[in-house]
């Protein structure tokens, strides 16, 4: 035993000496460093090291001078392996400033004119070091890149506030969450007495657990329940997030006996109105198809043939207003296209959301719809060539003009050209969409309405007048608001005064006749709203 103890002590002593030698060698070769300074000027990046406890990425002016002292460095704490104690305020805002001209301008210069490959590599190394430093300080935070007027780039982290619900701390005197020593003694005494008296069967003990009686254990149970109620009553819910361009007010209660429950406003602009009522959407569809096939934008379950899907959405036989009294039949001889959310009339920003909604609308609109078998005279669906209830309408010759819209003999199919799409492709798209949504609970109610914008405004006017006449207590409807067409709004509105706010127009009444007279259709099938 003595020999083993001596051997272990000798081994520990040798290990301590080796660690001291390694630490001494590390100190002589590379002194402890706790921050990095990256100086980048006109494509040249120089990385220096200092001995303070902060990370600085400084910049000089864009003139290309080597005086890095003229820059204003921004310091922020960095966790270093050689730092033993970290201050509590080291989790503050972390910034790194890279002051250079644009990389595009540098790469456009000739190698002989103040620019070389080595300088570009040095610049890239300095920028990468700044990114790595920020990620090391706050690996789970977002970054925001801000460009200054003098073509500098400021990389800021921890700019998004973190919301947390505040829960008051209850002390032991008020909470009563745990039973005191006396209650524990009583419970132990009752349990011992019950065991001495026989205790009863397991079923009786289960019943006693489910419904506690008025015995010594009841006050403790009630106190625990009271603590839960206090926590539930004192907890403050997180503030509701405002949706941009949709919700006007987040109001859910009023000061009188009525109720105010309304959905998001459906905001459209003049450009949205013109594109929604136009039958020619070739330019918009081509802009979508130009980027939609980029790898990584769509998921594996999305439809592969995007062109056929957009054909069904924008100019298919079920993409027009389903009302028999549509204003388009009187204006142009054919119904107007059905109204879609405004993201379908804007440049696409999120292709995943765009495609998922497009597939949902196609699935709902073409539910139970089948294209007829192609005839030898017509093998393509050039402008709605895949007609449905019209029987042999697929064999009809379709005019090439985008304004040549017409209704077939059945009165429910419209033929408007976008681009020739074969019927086989349309059937495959419908089969793929039905295979994705069939048998699943999908929000089909918002997409089930096939109504144009003017018919929707007419129905909104009727609903507004009915609500004003009947003094409805509950309103659950999302009214349409055209933001830059104030000339078409009448003086008749159903308004409500919110507490502490001015009058809010909930259901504006639009002059549909004035909107209809302001529409002008050109030969290309584009509609212009002259208001």
From Swiss-Prot:
Biased composition (Basic residues): 202-211
UniProtKB keywords: Early protein, Host nucleus
Localization per record: Host nucleus
Compositionally biased residues, Low complexity: 50-82
Primary localization class, coarse: host cell
Segments crossing the lipid bilayer: none
Compositional bias ranges of the Basic and acidic residues kind: 9-33
Keyword Phosphoprotein on entry: no
Region: Disordered, residue numbers: 1-92, 167-216
Family according to the record: Belongs to the herpesviridae UL95 family.
Role noted for this protein: Participates in the expression of late viral mRNAs. Expressed before viral DNA replication, UL95 assembles at the viral pre-replication complexes (pre-RCs) containing the early viral protein UL44.
Protein name per its UniProtKB record: Protein UL95
Annotated organism of origin: Human cytomegalovirus (strain AD169) (HHV-5)
């Amino acid at each position: 035993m003595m020999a083993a103890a001596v051997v272990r002590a000798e081994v520990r002593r040798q290990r301590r000496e080796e660690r001291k030698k390694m630490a001494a060698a590390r100190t002589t070769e590379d002194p402890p460093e706790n921050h990095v300074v990256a100086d980048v000027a006109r494509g040249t990046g120089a990385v220096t090291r200092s001995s303070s406890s902060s990370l600085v990425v400084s910049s000089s002016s864009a003139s290309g001078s080597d005086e890095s002292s003229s820059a204003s460095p921004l310091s922020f704490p960095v966790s270093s392996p050689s730092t033993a104690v970290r201050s509590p305020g080291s989790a503050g805002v972390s910034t790194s400033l890279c002051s250079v001209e644009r990389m595009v301008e540098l790469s456009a210069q000739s190698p002989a004119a103040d620019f070389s490959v080595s300088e570009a590599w040095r610049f890239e190394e300095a920028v990468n070091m700044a990114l790595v430093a920020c990620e090391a300080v706050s690996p789970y935070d977002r970054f925001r890149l801000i460009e200054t007027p003098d073509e500098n780039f400021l990389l800021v982290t921890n700019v998004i506030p973190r919301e947390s619900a505040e829960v008051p701390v209850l002390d032991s005197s008020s909470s009563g969450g745990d039973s005191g020593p006396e209650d524990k003694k009583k419970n132990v005494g009752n349990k011992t007495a019950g065991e001495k008296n026989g205790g009863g069967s397991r079923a009786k003990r289960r019943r006693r657990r489910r419904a506690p009686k008025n015995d010594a254990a009841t006050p403790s149970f009630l106190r625990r329940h009271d603590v839960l109620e206090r926590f539930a009553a004192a907890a403050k819910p997180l503030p509701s997030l405002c949706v941009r361009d949709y919700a006007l007010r987040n109001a859910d209660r009023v000061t009188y006996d009525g109720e105010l429950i309304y959905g998001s406003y459906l905001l459209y602009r003049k450009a949205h109105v013109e594109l929604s009522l136009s039958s020619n959407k070739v330019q918009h569809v081509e802009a979508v198809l130009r980027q939609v096939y980029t790898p990584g934008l769509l998921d594996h379950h999305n439809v592969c043939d995007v062109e056929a899907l957009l054909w069904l959405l924008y100019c298919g036989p079920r993409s027009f207003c389903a009302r028999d009294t549509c204003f388009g039949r009187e204006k142009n001889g054919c119904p107007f296209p059905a109204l879609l959310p405004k993201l379908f009339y804007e440049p696409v920003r999120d292709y995943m959301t765009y495609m998922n909604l497009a597939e949902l609308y196609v699935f709902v609109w073409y539910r139970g719809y089948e294209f007829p078998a192609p005839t030898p005279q017509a093998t393509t669906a050039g402008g709605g060539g895949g007609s449905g209830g019209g029987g042999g309408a697929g064999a009809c010759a379709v005019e090439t003009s985008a304004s040549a819209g017409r209704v077939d003999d059945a009165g429910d199919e419209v033929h408007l050209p976008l681009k020739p799409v074969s019927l086989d492709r349309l059937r495959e798209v419908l089969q793929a969409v039905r295979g994705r949504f069939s048998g699943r609970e999908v929000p089909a109610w918002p997409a089930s309405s096939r109504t144009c914008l003017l018919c929707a405004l007419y129905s909104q006017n009727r609903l507004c007048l009915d609500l004003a006449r009947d003094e409805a207590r509950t309103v659950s409807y999302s009214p349409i608001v055209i933001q830059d067409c104030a000339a078409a709004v009448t003086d008749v509105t159903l308004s409500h005064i919110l507490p502490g706010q001015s009058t809010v127009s909930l259901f504006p009444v639009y002059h549909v006749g004035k909107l209809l007279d302001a529409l002008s259709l050109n030969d290309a099938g584009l509609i212009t709203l002259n208001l």
